[in-house]
Amino acid sequence: EVRILIKEESEEEKGDLFGLEKFQIGWYRDGMFISSHNPFVENNEQITQKADELKSTIKTFNQAFGVSLPIYNVISNMGSISDFCQFFSAFDESKRDDVFGATAPYSKHGGIDADWFNDEYDHLISELIANMSNALAGQLNQDYRNSIASAPFQFGLLKQNLWLFLNRLYRGEQLSDALQFRGFYFTHDGQSSAQSDLLASTVSYSVGHEHYQHNEQIPVNQTLFAQYLMTHVILSEHELV
């Protein structure tokens, strides 16, 4: 097994490798995974810039080793989005270990299909809504119950920015195939971090307020959706390499 890693550096460390301070890239025999610690809450210009930088780095890797590896995108810090992780606080371990994301149909020429992305992301939202009753039934804490009710909306508000990033990263060029996109997945490492309340921000902006009061939530210290991602998704696709 071979692994190449672009390490995410803290703000205290000087500089960052290839300017990709928010990404971690692992290259295995069976493919490449891109782990994003920041779930794309920046403005459009910042998102497209990061996608372009990352694309250039991956193409350099592929050209250097003469490969076109399948790429798996992992948004690894969902605890930084208000309400999302609280939704799963009362679920049993088997549910929290399930993969939460989508694997794309194989395309010889790479790229990502807009209709496929829309359908799969909307399906994930519908799964949250379908499981809301079970989530509420297992949680008596009122703050958590409020988060459970908000979680599908918070998750839905990530869709546009994630698509902007993925579409920019995997769009093809005239004389070459696009990068080999395989899927997008969401995880939480159990660590607490600063949170973004996308729903409150959207509502405040819609009524003319530029700022809103954000209340930090109780962090969820359980790991979510990471247990089987490597074994059940990435390693199972070894024949693509």
Where are these regions (language model features)?
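Basic, amphipathic N-terminal segments
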Residues: 1-241
